[in-house]
Every structure is written in structure tokens, then in C-alpha cells.
Amino acid sequence: MSNVPAELKYSKEHEWLRKEADGTYTVGITEHAQELLGDMVFVDLPDVGTTVSAGDDCAVAESVKAASDIYAPVSGEIVAVNDALSDSPELVNSDPYTDGWIFKIRAADEAEVEALLDATAYAALLENE
């Protein structure tokens, strides 16, 4: 079974969300998602300053197997992207929950964050896939 850190929130599309000290949220794809995709070769990052709605495709992860959209788990403004992925997309594979993060977002509505899955619910989702 994939690693599902307890402190994160999760989307049904296999993105994770972590609240930062400055009130923003860091977003990436889960260990389960990167395992399905395989070795990353490119990550198309969103533009900083872009406003997105929950469920919008805002980035693309390209692997040796497929290209997969990455969706905004909550509505808000993209405030940072992980530029290290331009040269090292494999960070998404080796460290999906830390160095392999994809973007940071300032959430427009905290209720959307609360509506995401907790680790227990996400683990249950994985068991049913």
C-alpha cells in the first residue's frame, strides 16, 4: 500500500494538500499517483499569479507511460511553483510529499480545504480502486 501521510488532505484525483505556516497550501501528487504514472520525464507547471477553480487542470505530469493532468484541489491563486522540477522531474517519483511538490496556492475558500479527504478516507479510496 502507498504511503499516505496523516497530516495531509487529499483529492479523489490523487493530489495532496499541505497547509504552510504562511497560510498557503503546497500541492503535489500522491505516491500512489506517481507509482501509476511511472518515471517522470517532464512537469508542465502553472503560471504564478494564475487564478484557478477547484477541479481545474492546472499542470501536467508527463512520464514514460503517459501524460496526466494535475488538478487544483481547491480554488485560489497560484503563488509559487517548484522550479526544481524543470531540471529534475524525477523528484515527483523519489520524494512526492516533500521535494517533489508541484505548486503552492492561496486558497480562496477554506471550506473547500475542509471538504477534501483526510488520510483515512484517502487510504480507503485506494483500497477500493
Swiss-Prot record:
Gene Ontology biological-process entries: glycine decarboxylation via glycine cleavage system
Cofactors required: (R)-lipoate
Keywords: Lipoyl
PROSITE patterns: BIOTINYL_LIPOYL (PS50968), LIPOYL (PS00189)
Signal sequence extent: none
Annotated CDD domains: GCS_H
Listed GO CC annotations: cytosol; glycine cleavage complex
Function of the molecule: The glycine cleavage system catalyzes the degradation of glycine. The H protein shuttles the methylamine group of glycine from the P protein to the T protein.
Subunit structure: The glycine cleavage system is composed of four proteins: P, T, L and H.
Family: Belongs to the GcvH family.
Protein name: Glycine cleavage system H protein
